[in-house]
Design a protein with these regions (language model features):
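Short beta-strand segments within Ig-like beta-sandwich modules, predominantly Fibronectin type-III
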Residues: 438-442, 552-557
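Short coil-to-beta strand junction motifs in C2/discoidin
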Residues: 417-425, 530-539
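Bacterial Sec-dependent N-terminal signal peptides
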Residues: 1-26
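Predominantly extracellular/luminal regions of secreted and cell-surface proteins
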Residues: 298, 483-502
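Mature catalytic domains of secreted/periplasmic carbohydrate-active enzymes
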Residues: 23-451, 462-482, 486, 522
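Short, surface-exposed tryptophan/glycine-enriched loops
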Residues: 447-457, 562
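Asp-box/BNR beta-propeller loop motif
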Residues: 429-436, 543-551
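Non-catalytic, beta-strand-enriched accessory regions in extracellular/secretory proteins
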Residues: 393-399, 505-513
Length: 562
């Protein structure tokens, strides 16, 4: 299977671009392998010529996409279902997919991506593979199809459409019988990719827990991706794919230095674990493409970042979170640190039990859209779209519109000619003369930097360091109204970290130092590890002396942590 995986998923080609009076350049599409004896300079040259596929470039240009977590969990109040839920509880009273798409379209989103099946195995379409679906629910007397309704709404409002299909299925009896379940999963995937028009993104996550029989599954990624390539060849394959990678967190934070031309080998390749371990990189690593990394690498991938985060604390709708929708300031910060950090933002907006995007979310999305529109409809730079071929140390001066006050600058590279900028500085000409207002490392498709507002007449952009010649496609400057964080009262009174200590790791044992009253606890794994050891199911015990333990009714599982 490993050899098949490498053969069927190794997508790399060389193209030559040029025109009348232009020097032709060779480009490597999606992947480049370095010769064994390549010097660092040769690797830098080849890295500069790595470019996205047309699908990857089109995906990057969407900038803002929406996740719709909706399903049986919406009605149980859980984040991860166990597959034992009764389909009878799925009964949205006012489901309106057009309201979803219309709301998101008005807010500037370019694609919606639906959880057609989450880990609980409940399917939002009337699949022929299982009875654990909408066909067994009272919604529309078992005749409903959420996927179809969303597809039709996307067609009506000219919105791109994507699907999330969980490989982990806690309901399927065949899960853990690897060949049988893989065939089962491919039938589900085939239904989604043949019955619902064009699919622009297929999203698989890496969760792989036990099924109802207590067994784990070995996924046939090779067969899954062949199915996608045959049925939806224009779709990008995200996360457990080689078109789009996970940024490494669910907080909405990209990297300040975000390389799309990365040394990280996608996990679907059999060699990925060995390659990434040798380089010391993983999805959360900060450095994925520096010269130091190139020196150690044997190959490079065009593998851009997708930043996924929920507008609420949870991924599925919970009524108690209606007052906890992220503030406008929080969303703005996320936007600048995702889209503004050379990534695509995938913002989750979960429909409620009625089957509507909740009023609290709609209001915030409208505020978010109005805020962005006010900023980005008034570019202060004159002639900022003039192409600029920049080498290390070169600079260009741009005139600003009269009486311009700015606090945001934006740079863009033409990524169809590679990602090349490694360091830049921006200065503004004020009444006091030239002053530095912004600096950064990578640019890529889009880089935005915020700074204290200044009044200026000109901008001077300097490319301090780049690979070969950087193709700057736009320089822009804007003014963003300052936002203040909302004051919220949380009913948490966490014990100071200095007041307790860990005395054992397995089972995890904490000495609180004194007798305290507890009402809740939180848990998070270490962030610095590539594959940290994590608790999934738990029981909770308390003791007055560390010897005699009493179980309290707090057993469960940490959903959405793996």
């Amino acid at each position: 299977m490993m050899n098949k995986l490498l053969t069927s998923l190794f997508l790399s080609s060389v193209i030559t671009l040029g025109g009348c009076g232009l020097t032709k350049e060779n480009y490597y599409v999606k992947h480049v392998e370095f010769p064994q004896d390549a010097t660092l300079e040769q690797k830098i040259d080849m890295a500069a010529r790595l470019v996205p596929t047309p699908q990857q470039a089109a995906w990057q240009q969407m900038e803002l996409t929406a996740f719709l977590h909706f399903g049986i969990n919406t009605f149980t109040g859980r984040e991860w279902g166990d597959g034992q839920e009764d389909p009878a509880i799925f009964n949205p009273t006012e489901l309106d997919a057009e309201q979803w798409v219309r709301t998101l379209k008005d807010a500037g989103f370019k694609m919606v991506l639906l959880t057609a099946k989450h880990h609980d195995g409940f399917c939002l379409w009337p699949t022929a593979t299982t009875k654990h679906s909408v066909a067994s629910s009272p919604w529309k007397n078992g005749q409903g199809d959420v996927v179809k309704e969303l597809r039709n709404a996307c067609d009506k409002y000219d919105m791109k459409f994507g699907v999330y299909l969980s490989p982990w299925d806690r309901n399927a009896e065949c899960y853990g019988d690897s060949p049988k379940y893989n065939e089962f999963f491919i039938r589900q995937l085939t239904e989604l990719l043949t019955n619902y028009g064009e699919v622009h993104e297929v999203w698989f996550d890496g969760a792989n827990g036990e099924g109802p029989n207590g067994k784990k599954q070995i996924y046939d990624w090779d067969a899954f991706y062949k199915t996608i390539q045959q049925l939806q060849p224009k779709a990008v394959m995200a996360i457990m794919g080689d078109d789009v990678r996970w940024v490494g967190n669910e907080k909405g934070l990209g990297r300040e230095t975000e390389w799309s031309a990365t040394v990280l080998t996608p996990g679907i390749y059999a060699r990925s674990e060995e390659n990434n371990k040798r380089l010391g990189v993983f999805s959360k690593a900060e450095d994925l493409g520096s010269r130091a990394m190139l020196e150690k690498a044997t190959e490079l991938f065009w593998y851009p970042s997708e930043v996924d985060v929920s507008i609420r604390p949870g991924w599925f709708y919970h009524a108690e979170e209606d007052s906890k929708v992220k503030s406008l300031k929080h969303l703005a910060d996320i936007y600048f640190q995702s889209v503004g950090y050379n990534s695509v933002l995938l913002l989750n907006i979960p429909p409620d039990r009625r089957g509507l995007i909740n009023e609290a979310d709609v209001q915030r999305l409208n505020e978010f859209a109005a805020y962005r529109e006010k900023i980005f409809t008034n570019n202060r730079v004159e002639k900022g779209r003039k192409d600029w071929e920049a080498v290390s140390g070169s600079e260009t001066v741009y005139s600003l519109k009269p009486e311009s006050e700015i606090n945001v600058v934006m740079l863009q590279e033409d990524i169809t000619k590679g990602q090349r900028v490694e360091s830049f500085t921006v200065e503004a000409l004020t009444e006091q003369g030239w002053q530095e207002v912004a600096k950064g490392t990578t640019v890529g498709y889009k880089r935005m930097v915020r700074f204290p507002a200044v009044k200026a007449t000109q901008l001077r952009v300097k490319i301090n360091e780049c690979r070969l010649t950087a193709h700057i496609s736009q320089v822009a400057a804007y003014y963003a109204d300052p936002l203040e964080e909302e004051n919220r009262t949380e009913n948490w009174n966490n014990l100071p970290r200095a007041s307790w200590k860990q005395v054992a790791a397995s089972p995890l044992t904490i000495d609180l130092g004194k007798e305290v009253e507890l009402s809740a606890f939180t848990y998070a794994p270490l962030k610095a590890e590539a594959k940290p050891t994590m608790a999934f199911r738990y029981k909770f015990y308390v003791s007055a002396d560390g010897k005699n333990w009493k179980e309290v009714p707090a057993n469960g599982e940490f959903s959405n942590i793996m």
